[in-house]
């Protein structure tokens, strides 16, 4: 005994609804999985970036040319001297945001006497989709009286007053979707600039 045409149409309709439902469910699962992976990857990248910045800032010291340890201190830029490769020479390190990209510039001193030639700066990209702004700065600076709740130093920063730097990294993990900003924060005391030892 066979199926009637009406029974066949009903079965095809039910199977069609099941296929559409399963496909929609699968698409949602894959989309959420991709978002979770992107977020996890972005979080790991941010932690790695923060660890590097903190390590380099912690060992800030005067340049080989006798310059003060910190060169520039602004909301989304910092430049300083630090021996990052253990060769005894202090590299000039600069972290800055260009549009929505976090970059790092390094100048190795050359010549005799040693000089830091800005034409020799090697710039690398650290992260994309950075959303820091003047109202949510990448760097905040504090003096030796920082108690944990004090306000940061006001602009323009007097670099000789800086003893602690707070780093706030705002990343948009997926710029193609509505902004879901992730904030990663760390702070560092500048060991070689302490005067309360």
Set out the residue ranges of the language-model regions:
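Flexible, active-site-adjacent loop/turn segments at secondary-structure boundaries
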Residues: 28, 38-40, 68, 124, ...
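Aliphatic-rich helix starts adjacent to a transmembrane/signal segment
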Residues: 3-59, 197
């Amino acid at each position: 005994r066979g199926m009637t045409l009406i029974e066949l149409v009903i079965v095809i309709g039910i199977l069609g609804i099941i296929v559409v439902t399963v496909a929609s469910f699968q698409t949602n699962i894959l989309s959420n999985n991709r978002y979770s992976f992107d977020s996890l990857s972005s979080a790991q990248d941010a932690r790695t970036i923060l660890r590097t910045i903190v390590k380099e800032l912690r060992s800030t010291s005067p340049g080989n040319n006798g310059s003060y340890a910190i060169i520039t201190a602004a909301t989304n830029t910092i430049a300083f001297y630090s021996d990052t490769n253990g060769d005894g020479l202090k590299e000039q390190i600069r972290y800055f945001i260009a549009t929505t990209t976090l970059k790092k510039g390094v100048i190795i001193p050359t010549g005799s006497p040693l000089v830091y030639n800005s034409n020799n700066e090697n710039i690398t990209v650290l992260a994309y989709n950075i959303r820091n702004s003047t109202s949510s700065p990448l760097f905040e600076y504090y003096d030796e009286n920082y108690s944990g709740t004090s306000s940061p130093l006001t602009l323009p920063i007097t670099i000789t007053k800086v003893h602690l730097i707070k780093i706030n990294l705002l990343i948009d993990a997926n710029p193609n979707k509505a902004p879901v900003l992730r904030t990663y924060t760390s702070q560092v005391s500048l060991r070689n600039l302490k005067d309360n030892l």
